[in-house]
């Protein structure tokens, strides 16, 4: 028995993914709280267009910050000659410049994400909408990628509050279907992205071939990576027993077995080992790891667990 297996009597289908109404997606109170937040990145990214993100750079801007010794290759226009006259040493002016950040929202939409109420995909979509809203109100660029057996769909990075509605429309049309090949899909998105940024990957990570090499593709391109691991309450604590017929939701493989206390204990032990493996990988590669059970309200998860990590 694996977390990806389903009991055939349960009517989980892609049609169960509810359409998302942009007018009722979030309460005005939650949106007001999101407006006071910004994206938090552990790396500095040089963008094409200035946003509202402040970073320390040498060169021209609106606010002087500090000096540092001149280095080979520095632009002589930013040498402070008055300091040179006093100290007989070359120093370059530093300014607070504006940093442009691109938020990459990467969603696993394979068939295993169509489980639970809400489904894991529905939860990921609402979460992506919340993070995207924060990006838009801060004039950051926000893009979306959808992975299944490969990189299936995408919404090109865009900027501005007016883009929130179109992004929600795109998100609401995503359907969970097909097998999972996370490594291939994630690698394809990382390689196609023109420039790195803050990547938030949302998945249940239920791929027998793993996910690690796909995530490494983002690290190799110098993305700041956060992994949001979605699990349904029933996957954490299965409550079924007896003679069952299980069907793999992605491959269609059928397995009949009797579930007793020993089988449930074995399942929980394997799940624990799986979660420890994921956490260990993320810790070793300095990836932000955030596990969420989908009965946790999206608003609570965003404001209590992501604030101070993905959001500031």
Label each region the model flagged.
Residues 2-158, 198-203, 208-209, 213-217, ...:
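An amphipathic, basic-hydrophobic helix/alpha-beta surface used to engage anionic
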Residues 2-56, 191-197, 207-209, 213-312:
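Von Willebrand factor type A / integrin I
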Residues 62, 76, 98, 162, ...:
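Charged, alpha-helix-enriched surfaces in structured cytosolic catalytic cores
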Residues 122, 176-183, 269-272:
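Conserved phosphate-coordination/catalytic loops
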Residues 126, 130, 180-187, 276, ...:
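Short, contiguous clusters of charged residues that form electrostatic/catalytic patches at enzyme active sites
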Residues 155-169, 261, 307-308:
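Short, electropositive alpha-helical surface patch
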Residues 163-197, 209, 231-232, 236:
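Von Willebrand factor
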């Amino acid at each position: 028995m694996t977390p990806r297996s389903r009991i055939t009597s349960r009517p989980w289908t892609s049609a169960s993914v509810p359409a998302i109404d942009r007018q009722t997606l979030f309460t005005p109170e939650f949106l007001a709280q999101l407006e006071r937040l910004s994206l938090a990145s552990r790396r500095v990214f040089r963008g094409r267009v200035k946003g509202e993100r402040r970073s320390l750079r040498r060169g021209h801007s609106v606010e002087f910050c500090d000096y540092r010794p001149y280095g080979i290759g520095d632009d002589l226009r930013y040498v402070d000659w008055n300091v040179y006259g006093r100290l007989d040493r070359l120093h370059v002016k530093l300014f607070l410049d504006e940093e442009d950040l691109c938020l990459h929202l990467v969603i696993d939409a394979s068939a295993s994400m169509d489980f639970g109420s809400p489904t894991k995909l529905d939860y990921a979509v609402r979460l992506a909408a919340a993070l995207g809203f924060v990006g838009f109100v801060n004039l950051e660029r926000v893009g979306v990628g959808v992975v299944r057996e490969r990189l299936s769909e995408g919404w090109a990075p865009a900027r501005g509050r007016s883009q929130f509605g179109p992004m929600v429309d795109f998100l609401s049309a995503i359907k969970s279907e097909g097998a999972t090949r996370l490594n291939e899909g994630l690698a394809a998105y990382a390689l196609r992205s023109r420039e790195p940024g803050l990547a938030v990957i949302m998945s249940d990570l239920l791929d027998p071939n793993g996910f690690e090499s796909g995530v490494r593709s983002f690290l190799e391109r110098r993305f700041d990576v956060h992994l949001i691991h979605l699990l349904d309450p029933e996957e954490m604590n299965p409550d079924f027993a007896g003679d069952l017929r299980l069907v793999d939701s992605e491959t269609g493989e059928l397995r009949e077995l009797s579930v007793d206390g020993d089988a449930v204990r074995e399942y929980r032990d394997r799940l624990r080992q799986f979660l420890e493996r994921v956490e260990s990988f993320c810790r070793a590669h300095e990836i932000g790891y955030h596990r969420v059970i989908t009965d946790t309200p999206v608003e609570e998860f965003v404001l209590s667990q992501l604030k101070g990590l993905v959001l500031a």
